[in-house]
Regions:
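C-terminal helix-rich "cap/oligomerization" subdomain common to oxidoreductases
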Residues: 8-20, 24-48, 116-118, 274, ...
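Beta-loop-alpha module in the N-terminal Rossmann-like domain of NAD(P)-dependent dehydrogenases
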Residues: 60, 96-159
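Active-site loop of classical SDR/Rossmann-like NAD(P)-dependent oxidoreductases
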Residues: 62, 337-348
Length: 385
């Protein structure tokens, strides 16, 4: 199938999908606060009940709900939940009432039926917890960022090599976004030719009053490029077809929050990938209150034969539903609305990878490289405000 045939066939498939029962749309997901964003999709189990038991621990960030949504829709069974805060545990049980409450992390790790542990601890604690989990013979699924220091990354690499376990990362801005997964397929098919440049714009809503204290402590959250920048570096590696990249420029600043001096509310970086592709990312905490979603995330992919623009969470002033894909090539222009029509295959692939020791969902090298680039960019960043 040539490039044009692929695009036409894809458009026809998406159009036909409009006649099928839809998954929960972006409008049906709570989207105004990024920290509460937990996408839901169509159940697509790859295992039966009780065949792949997991635990959810350290519920410091509400991304744990998106992580568990994806895993349970793929067939995983949440056997345990553990956190030192009983209020967090009670809230989790409202969403996942079948989980049992563990008295400690040790109780979770002692259960031979638990195959994977999902964790959304304070950013700076995720890496060390992962090593403990892997040493206990479990695979580990961390919220992003998985690390806040290079030492943590190196420790995790050593633990993976020693134990043979997985340390996967919830890079949700691609893995849990249908437009981004659709673009992944377009790029990998060769539909836009060789990728020259990737640009990701990722504004987020700060919601300062509802954030925990650790969110504003530099040593605990890691810096803006380490944190929400990690999503963008992962997307560049994927869309750019890169296994490595060089950070040529990075900057961070605090432009609007003098009462939180350790917060970085703006960051940007430029990278050059080993495939020849170039990258620019911008991240910030300045989503205006008038936007009904947590951020107007955009991705622009320039290929030698076509361009792609993703309007991930909203089409501003036009549609509040997200997952818009705009494609332009030599033959014309297309706008595809893919919400509810692509799904979130990463989670099922991750479960099968854990069972079979494969790497279809994501390679370990890729997961770690995205974090490594974010740490390098953070360390190199010039403070501009």
């Amino acid at each position: 199938m040539n490039r044009r045939e692929f695009l036409c066939a894809t458009a026809a498939t998406v159009a036909a999908g409009a006649l099928l029962p839809r998954a929960a749309s972006a409008e049906e997901v709570q989207k105004s606060e990024g920290m509460n964003y937990a996408p839901k999709g169509k159940p697509n189990p790859v295992v039966g009940p009780g065949e792949f038991n997991i635990a959810a621990i350290r519920l410091d960030h509400n991304h744990i709900y998106g992580m568990c949504n994806g895993l349970t829709e793929a067939g995983a069974t949440i056997k345990w939940v553990w956190d030192a805060d009983p209020k967090k545990v009670a809230a989790f049980l409202e969403k996942f009432p079948g989980a049992k409450v563990a008295s400690s992390l040790e109780e979770v790790l002692a259960d031979p039926e638990v195959k994977l542990v999902a964790c959304a601890a304070v950013n700076s604690e995720r890496g060390p917890i992962g090593c403990t989990v892997m040493e206990a013979g479990k695979d580990y699924f961390s919220d992003k960022p998985p690390f806040t220091t290079m030492d943590q990354l190196n420790q995790a690499k050593a633990t993976v090599a020693k134990t043979g376990r997985k340390h996967m990362v919830y890079y949700a801005e691609r893995l849990h976004n249908e437009s981004a997964m659709f673009a992944t397929d377009l790029v990998e098919s060769g539909a836009i030719g060789k990728v020259i440049s990737v640009t990701t714009i990722a504004p987020h809503r700060l919601s300062k009053a509802s954030r925990p204290a650790w969110f504003f402590e530099r040593d605990k959250y890691g810096g803006i490029l380490c944190d929400i920048g990690s999503h963008q570096f992962e997307q560049f590696l994927t869309f750019g077809g890169c296994t490595d990249a060089t950070v040529s420029y990075a900057a961070v600043g605090n432009f609007g929050n003098p009462d939180k001096p350790e917060l970085e509310d703006f960051g940007e970086a430029c990278l050059a990938g080993d495939s020849g592709a170039l990258d620019y990312i911008r991240v910030d905490w300045f989503t205006p209150d008038g936007l009904p979603v947590w951020g107007d995330g955009r991705t622009f992919i320039l290929g030698t034969k076509a361009t792609i623009e993703l309007r991930k969470y909203i089409d501003v002033a036009r549609e509040t539903v997200g997952d818009h894909v705009y494609i332009v090539d030599a033959k014309g222009m297309q706008h595809l609305s893919v919400a509810g029509k692509v799904g979130f295959r990463f989670f099922g692939e991750l479960i099968l990878d854990c069972i079979h020791g494969t790497e279809k969902a994501m390679t370990q090298a890729h997961a770690f490289k995205a974090s490594e680039l974010s740490l390098i960019a953070q360390a190199k960043a010039q403070r501009v405000a």
